[in-house]
């Protein structure tokens, strides 16, 4: 069951974010994210004339290559569509993420590395869901490989992972 609709309403804005995780032939992982913003109506743009209904006015992509330790080995980004002519330049500092490790403090380090007046707010924001996608991709792949190696369908007890302790209700440590 979904959310109840509280009142009559009309959709005016769509933001689509898709993240995907890939294992590479070299054993590293590519984490890719895409953001697309569109409106449900035509609107004027100083730099693009009229932006048509359902046409993207933000469309960005990022790829981070990470190792098993979640260290960024390579980074690439592109702004395919932005509201201003300068927007594509905001992807230019994405390589500042190389060498950073996904983990506690990731958002702060990303903001320092690629945010602010030389970066792009939307690309910076995309790195948050990319981090959780990296965790899901790598953790799932490690478990899958362990099951294949032992020919077992038993899932490992993820509650044993200390890095997840108290990160959400499922991993809350109860007092005895």
Regions flagged by a language model, labelled:
Residues 1-3, 7-12, 16-17, 21-24:
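N-terminal, Lys/Arg-enriched amphipathic/low-complexity engagement segments
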Residues 14, 21-23, 35-176:
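Active-site- and interface-proximal helix/loop "cap" or "latch" segments in soluble metabolic
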């Amino acid at each position: 069951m979904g959310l109840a609709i509280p009142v009559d309403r009309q959709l005016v804005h769509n933001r689509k974010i898709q993240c995907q995780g890939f294992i590479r032939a070299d054993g590293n992982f590519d984490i890719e994210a895409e953001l697309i913003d569109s409106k449900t109506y035509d609107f004027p743009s100083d730099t693009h004339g009229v932006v048509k209904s359902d046409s993207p006015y933000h469309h960005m992509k990022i790829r981070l290559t990470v190792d098993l330790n979640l260290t960024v080995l390579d980074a690439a980004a592109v702004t395919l569509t932005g509201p201003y002519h300068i927007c594509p330049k905001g992807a230019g500092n994405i390589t500042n993420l190389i060498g950073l490790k996904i983990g506690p403090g990731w958002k702060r380090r990303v903001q320092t590395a690629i945010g602010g007046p030389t970066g792009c707010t939307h690309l910076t924001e995309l790195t948050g869901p990319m981090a959780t996608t990296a965790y899901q991709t790598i953790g799932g792949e490690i478990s899958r490989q362990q099951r294949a190696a032992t020919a077992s369908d038993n899932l490992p007890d993820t509650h044993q992972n200390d890095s997840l302790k108290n990160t959400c209700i499922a991993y809350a440590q109860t007092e005895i």
